[in-house]
A protein has these predicted regions:
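A generic fold-level signal
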Residues: 10, 33, 44, 101-103
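Gly/Ser/Thr-rich beta-alpha loop segments that engage phosphate groups in nucleotides
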Residues: 21, 45-47, 154
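Residues at secondary-structure transition points
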Residues: 37-44, 71
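Positively charged, low-complexity intrinsically disordered leader regions
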Residues: 1-37
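Conserved N-terminal subdomain of the carbohydrate kinase-like
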Residues: 60-156
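Short secondary-structure boundary/capping elements
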Residues: 14, 41-48, 133-134
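A short alpha-helix capping/helix-coil boundary motif
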Residues: 27-31, 54-60, 147-151
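Alpha-helix C-terminal capping segments
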Residues: 41, 48-60, 82
Length: 156
């Protein structure tokens, strides 16, 4: 298999990912069901890869995702930006404030300890990205080279 890299000068990003980014809530050393406080993180399979490419190799990366347009969505955007990943390709979805239109995904993960394995559960029903359509993102513009009027992505 041949890796096809576009010239860097033709591309805004080295790599992008498409997928759900959830708010990860970590109860520390305790259990989810008894915790009274949680540490918040961002996470998601595709996003974790793109963040790692930026952090480990200094690549210019972006995430293509969708969030409910509310304070939790803005918090997740801020977490992504703190990780050095570009957020300009996020699609913001209207929300009604109670989750009927859309919401942001939540992931609860407790750490393994000794012989007890890690445990987690996700609350992903009706999330903004699950309702996204191809029309929500201009893929032609994202993947077209800069000289052709697009953003350009090196890795295809």
């Amino acid at each position: 298999m041949k890796l096809n890299l576009r010239p860097a000068e033709e591309c805004t990003f080295d790599a992008v990912s498409l997928g759900e980014v959830m708010l990860r809530l970590d109860p520390g050393e305790g259990r989810i069901r008894t915790a009274r406080s949680f540490r918040a993180w961002e996470g998601g399979g595709e996003y974790n890869v793109i963040r790692g490419l930026h952090k480990c190799f200094g690549m210019k990366t972006a995430v293509i995702t969708s969030f409910a347009d509310n304070e939790v969505g803005l918090l997740m955007k801020d977490f992504i930006e703190q990780g050095g990943v570009d957020t300009s390709l996020i699609c913001w979805k209207k929300t009604d404030g109670i989750g009927r239109l859309c919401r942001n995904g939540l992931n609860f993960t407790e750490r393994g300890f000794g012989i007890r394995g890690a445990k987690g559960c996700s609350d992903r029903a009706n999330t903004a990205i699950s309702q996204a359509t191809p029309e929500d993102f201009d893929f032609d513009y994202i993947f077209k080279n800069k000289s052709d009027g697009g953003l350009g992505v090196r890795w295809l």
